[in-house]
Amino acid sequence: MLNQEKNKFVFMITQIRGRLIEKSPTEVVVDCNGIGYSINISLNTFSKIGSDENIKLYTHLIIKEDSHSLYGFFEKSERSLFRLLISVSGVGASTGRMMLSSLSPNEIVSAIMTENVQVIQSIKGIGLKTSQRVILELKDKVLSLEGSEQQELNLNNESSEAASALEVLGYSQKQTSKILSKIITENPGINV
């Protein structure tokens, strides 16, 4: 077992590699040396799993008094985001999986970074208070996720000219960043 102080999780099964036996939008069964593991997945992971017979998933094991549940993710960054989401009070594993099924990890990170309550609240089962709590508790933490720095860097490079123009018009740097991030998130192909 690996104890990581940073997240205060104890990880026992961190990945599974094996033969794909069954696949549905909510779970897969992976045969690993004769043992079939039932693994809960998000729609995001489901969409990335091909029809290949061999599969590798990064996992998170949740042990409760009455159940052991294994959650699988196609990418480490999705697993990291899941772990952050379930660290928020009021967000359990099912809600975390629902969030990752409703929005892509990049959309969730972007909504948190831009404090876009409406995007997070649009997810089934997430109310106003929970969406505000997710943003408040994770805003600083999502920057440590793999890919978030790159996303922010791309946002800065793409929109530096637009940001300068908005600042000349009197908007603060924080307001400018929020506005441009929202525009780029809502219109991914747009050139600002």
Outline where the language-model segments fall.
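Structure-specific DNA junction-binding interface
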Residues: 2-87, 192
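Amphipathic, charged-and-aliphatic alpha-helical interface segments
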Residues: 68-73, 93-112, 133-146
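A general alpha-helix detector
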Residues: 80-84, 95, 116-119, 158-165, ...
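A short amphipathic alpha-helix within small helical-bundle interaction modules
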Residues: 85, 100, 108-113, 120, ...
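Short amphipathic alpha-helical segments at helix boundaries and their inter-helical linkers
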Residues: 110-113, 184-192
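Anionic-ligand binding region
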Residues: 115-125, 134
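Strongly charged, low-complexity linkers/loops
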Residues: 134-184
